């Protein structure tokens, strides 16, 4: 360092320059760290959006499956409601044989992400669960080869129609890809006819 002294370089300037270099390096390092964190968070948000979009499509498909089953079961109940003894227990079991909603149950911790649809989503699958238990109670009180009676048939038909209507609400809001459009329109028309027939048949009882 003798040559610095020989040219008259003040050590104070050198120290100041060194400190400024360290400060600039620190600022650049801090900025780089912020950029890395920002990029990581951005990538994470993109991943979450992709995963949620996939979940919406999966849940939407499951809702469609159950909605078709409920409107079909409702139609079977209506066809049997004129019988004096109502629907047979065998037909009731066959019509209301719903599978376990695997996608919904395995993603219960993500239900809150569906925002304004959360209540309807929980109500849809909750009503199906309640209906299963109702069918089990009816089975416990009816002979295996017997019928469930007109009142029980009407009650089950009303619950099935309500579930179908909730399903219609959900598929139009949770996920509505174009490749489902034709099937969704057919379902809406089928539900509209079922709702109109129900209201004409039971004008004072509404949809439940």
Language model segments and positions:
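Membrane-embedded hydrophobic alpha-helical segments
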Residues: 1-47
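Helix-centric, low-specificity signal for extended rod-like, repetitive segments
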Residues: 12-14, 35-38, 49, 125, ...
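An N-terminal structural lobe/cap that precedes and organizes the functional/catalytic core
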Residues: 36-40, 45-46, 52, 73, ...
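Juxtamembrane membrane-water interface segments immediately C-terminal to a transmembrane helix
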Residues: 43-64, 68
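Interfacial alpha-helical end/capping and short helix-turn segments at domain and membrane boundaries
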Residues: 61-208
């Amino acid at each position: 360092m003798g040559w610095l002294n020989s040219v008259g370089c003040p050590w104070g300037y050198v120290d100041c320059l060194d400190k400024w270099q360290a400060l600039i390096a620190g600022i650049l390092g801090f900025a780089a760290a912020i950029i890395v964190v920002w990029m990581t968070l951005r990538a994470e948000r993109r991943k979450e959006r992709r995963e949620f979009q996939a979940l919406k499509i999966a849940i939407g498909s499951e809702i469609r499956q159950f909605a078709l089953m409920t409107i079909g079961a409702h139609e079977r109940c209506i066809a049997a409601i004129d019988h004096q003894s109502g629907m047979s227990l065998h037909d009731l079991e066959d019509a209301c044989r719903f599978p376990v909603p695997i996608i919904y149950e395995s993603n219960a911790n993500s239900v809150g992400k569906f925002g304004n649809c959360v209540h309807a989503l929980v109500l849809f699958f909750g009503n199906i669960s309640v209906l299963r238990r109702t069918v089990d109670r009816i089975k416990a009180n009816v002979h295996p080869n017997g019928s469930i009676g007109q009142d029980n048939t009407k009650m089950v038909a009303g619950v099935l129609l309500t579930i179908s209507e909730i399903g219609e609400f959900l598929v139009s809001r949770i996920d509505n890809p174009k490749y489902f459009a034709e099937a969704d329109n057919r379902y809406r028309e089928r539900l509209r006819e079922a709702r109109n027939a129900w209201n004409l048949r039971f004008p004072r009882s509404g949809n439940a």
